[in-house]
A protein has these predicted regions:
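An accessory alpha-helical subdomain
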Residues: 163-178, 185-189
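Active-site glycine-rich loop that binds ribose-phosphate moieties when present
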Residues: 143, 147-149
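Small/polar glycine-rich anion-binding or flexible loop at a beta-alpha turn
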Residues: 139-143, 168-170
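N-terminal catalytic or cofactor-binding beta/alpha core of small enzyme domains
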Residues: 1-140, 151-156, 160, 191-222
């Protein structure tokens, strides 16, 4: 079956949900441009990212790969341009590991560029009235590690397969919880919080569906 692999990170950092995981689940099994979306959850773990992603690509043999993650405070659909071979955490991953000044892979490659049609995706989303932008940093946590790993694996095994990473905003319920916590802690004033932007999950799901459609449009099903 011609397919696209869509991954979404599980909740992390004490958060109850992750819009990336919810979006992946919403689109799993959907047929877009004749390709079936194969959704898979990813633990927020460097160990799991390194082991699971190559295996998923080997098992599914997708025609494209799009990975999803959360960027707290982001107000738009954020299309990542580049993955770098750096791991540097500010908080532990879900294994409890706290990595500083590490590498995603030991192959010496410093960075890899996403191969999704980023400008076309951005234009399609903006035409739909959905805020979107191309970003030149995916950070140095697991989202970047995911992007670099996928691009690294595909460069060696299937360089014709387009792949990339999309960062998503909070959903409104998450921001509501942040504000409640802020009120109860009384440690910060409201204007000091920089992470209170959000987007409805339905709009996020539609945006990712559009990104998939733009990526796959005109591609021949294997």
């Amino acid at each position: 079956v011609a397919s696209i692999l869509l991954t979404g990170f599980e909740p992390y950092g004490g958060r109850g949900i992750n819009p990336a995981h919810e979006t992946m689940r919403a689109l799993d099994g959907r047929v877009i441009e004749g390709f079936t979306v194969v959704g898979r959850g990813l633990p927020v773990s460097l160990r799991e990212v390194r082991s699971r992603l190559p295996q998923l690509i080997e098992d599914i043999k997708p025609s494209a790969v799009i990975c999803l993650g959360l960027w707290p405070g982001e107000a738009a659909i954020r299309l990542e341009r580049i993955g770098i071979n750096v791991v540097d955490y500010e908080i532990p991953d879900n294994d409890g590991a706290l990595v500083n000044d590490g590498a995603v892979a030991s192959n010496g490659q410093e960075a890899r560029l996403a191969t999704l049609p980023l400008r076309e995706i951005e234009a399609a989303l903006l035409d739909q009235g959905t805020p979107a932008r191309i970003s030149s940093t995916a950070g140095t946590f697991l989202c970047n590690a995911c992007l670099f790993t996928v691009l690294d694996v595909l460069a060696a095994r299937a360089p014709q397969v387009p792949a990339g990473f999309i960062h998503l905003p909070y959903v409104p319920s998450q921001v509501a919880e942040l504000i409640k916590a802020m009120r109860s802690e009384a440690a910060l004033e409201f204007h000091q919080r920089a992470d209170i932007a959000s987007m409805e999950l339905s709009r996020i799901v539609n945006a990712v569906e559009t990104a998939i459609a733009v990526t796959l449009k005109g591609r021949v099903r294997a």
